[in-house]
Amino acid sequence: AHLKDEILFLSEKYGGGSIERYIEKLINHRNTRCVERALYQANDDLKDSKPAEEISQTFVNTIAKSLSQRKGVVACGAASKQAYAEFLEVDAGGTQAISTGLPKLDAILGGGFKKGSLYVLAARPGVGKSALAIQMTYETAKRGLRTSYASLEMTASECAGRLLSNASGVRKPTSKGFLQPGHKQKLEKQVQAMQSWPITFKDDSTSTLQGLQAFLAKQRLEGELGLIVVDYLQLLGVPGMDSRVQEISLISRTLKQIALEMDCSVLALSQLNRALESQNRNPMLSDLRESGSIEQDADCVLLMHREKEVDPTKDNIICNVAKNRNGEVRATKLTFTKPTGRFSSQEPEPSLHQKNPF
């Protein structure tokens, strides 16, 4: 009652517009105080001779978290109106979700990737999970949304090379004179177009969770992000932790928190257990390496594998949406053109009317 009286008093005295300006000033003051505290802490850490990299990462993470625009409390009435608006948007054929560029996969995901959600894309090596993630990065950037690609096994130029082949349709040369007439012009035109794409790559050797957080925090300070890709989850480490299971649990939980705090989609690539190759069966959620926490924290898990009856002229890939917190659980068939790293939807779809064919 006391708070309500204060709000009514302010409304009568200053008017609605003035209250909004007053709240904005309070937020700015809070952020300023947070920066001051972070600076004092960094100064104390320097006096204690802590490593400069650790101090820098902690400082950036603190600032980025404090400047998060997510609200701590949302009234049920406001949330229900937002939910209803989203229902109507989807019903009308529109969506705020980020398209994967694969219409049939989008249909299963409810339009594509959603803000605040953690997606896990898992496969054995060589199936094409990095290629698919690169393509999804390209599709996101085409829509003008900022994307950060954090590869822990490829350099920025290697990632960009895959992106260039995917977008241009020209495979990477493997020998002298490999490029055909017209290929250079295609590549040059594509490179020119890529100058304005809102994509950044992580290009350093750090593979710690804290290092990833610092990289993403810097990106967030430069503006809102649409999609974050982490390639891949098992390569991340947390110094000082004894148990790998606990380490993976912290990593997956942190990635989910990043999606929520930065209000964006996070796509984390993951390995499947090696034993799967000798068991002659399709992958399941339990095949995720250190699977318990990954499966629990993810909003959606996509499992990729090659179709058993393989056409020698192309790779047929089954992408099974094995967990989907906000949609259907079923599979879609993709064609993978390996030389250019390009995926496309196939006809017909595999077992579309079954709840889960695997």
Annotate the PLM regions.
Residues 225-268:
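Helical hairpin unit composed of two closely spaced alpha helices linked by a short loop
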Residues 147, 266, 301-303:
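Short, well-ordered beta-strand core segments
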Residues 71-170, 189, 357-358:
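The Walker A/P-loop phosphate-binding site
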Residues 209-228, 254-262, 275-358:
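C-terminal regions of RecA-like/P-loop NTPase motor modules
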Residues 107, 139-224, 238, 331-335, ...:
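Cytosolic-facing regulatory segments adjacent to core modules
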Residues 16-19, 32, 99-102, 106, ...:
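Amphipathic alpha-helical transducer elements in NTP-driven molecular machines
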Residues 152-154, 264, 269-271:
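Conserved H-loop
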Residues 1-91, 115, 126-127, 169:
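Short, small/acidic-rich helices and loops at N termini and domain boundaries
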